Amino acid sequence: MENFDITLLQNIAYIFAAILFITGIKMLGKEATAQKGNVISAVGMFIAIIVTAINIVNPFVVLGGILLGAFIGSVIAVKVKMTSIPEMVALFNGFGGLATFFIAWSEMSNTNDNLFQYLLVILTIYIGGVTFSGSLIAFGKLSERLKIGKGHLLTNLFISIFYISLVSILAMLVLPMIGSLPLNFETIFYVYLALVMLGGVGFVLPIGGGDMPVVISLLNSLSGI
C-alpha cells in the first residue's frame, strides 16, 4: 500500500468519467432518455473536474467555481422557455468554447521547445475562440436579436476575416517548423487571438436562422474536440 500511486486511481476515475460522458451523450439522441443522459453526462464531467483539479489548485476554489456555475446555469435553465432551448444551448456551448480558449491561452507559456504541445495549443485556441464567438452569433440569430442579412456589408467583411483567420492558423502552425519564433512573436500571437474571435463571427454570420441547429451541432462537436 505504501507504493500505491494516486495517479492509477485518477486514471481509473478518468475512464469511468469518459464512459459516463459518452453514455450520456448517446442517450441524448432519444427523447425518452435525454433527461437522464444529460444528468449522466453532468456527473461524468463533475468527476473529471474533481480528479483533474485535486492536485493542481485549492479544492475549495474548484468547488466554489462548480457551485457558482451550477447555480447560474440552473437559474437560466429554469427561467428559459421551451421554445428558447436552442438559444440557451448555443449560449452555454459558447461559454464552454471560451473556457477552452482561456485554458489553451494559459498553457502557451509552457510550450517552450515542445513542438507538439505548441501545435496543440494553437489549434485549441482556434477551436475554442471560433466556438465562442460563433455560438454568440448563433444565439443572436435564433433569438432574433441579430438581424444582418447574408449580403450585408458587415457579413462580407467578417467572411473575409474568417478566411484570414484560416490563413493565420496555418501560419502559426508552420512558423516553428521553418525556424525559431520571431522576436515580435507576442504581438503576432495577440493578433492571432483577435483574428480567431472575429473569424468565428464570420463563420456563422452568413448562415440563415433555419440552419442554426446544424451550426450549433457543429460548434458543439468542435468544442468536444
Give residue spans per PLM region:
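C-terminal ends of transmembrane helices
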Residues: 20-35, 70-89, 135-149, 199-212
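Cytoplasmic-side transmembrane-helix entry/capping segments in multi-pass membrane proteins
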Residues: 35-44, 62-65, 84-96, 149-161, ...
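Helix-loop-helix hairpins and the membrane-proximal interhelical loops
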Residues: 40, 47, 146-194
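Interhelical loops and loop-helix junctions of multi-pass membrane transporters/channels
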Residues: 82-157
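Helical transmembrane-bundle signal
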Residues: 14-27, 45-52, 97-103, 107, ...
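Structural signature of hydrophobic alpha-helical transmembrane segments
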Residues: 4-18, 55-71, 117-132, 182-195
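Transmembrane alpha-helix boundary signature
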Residues: 52-63, 75-86, 101-115, 174-181
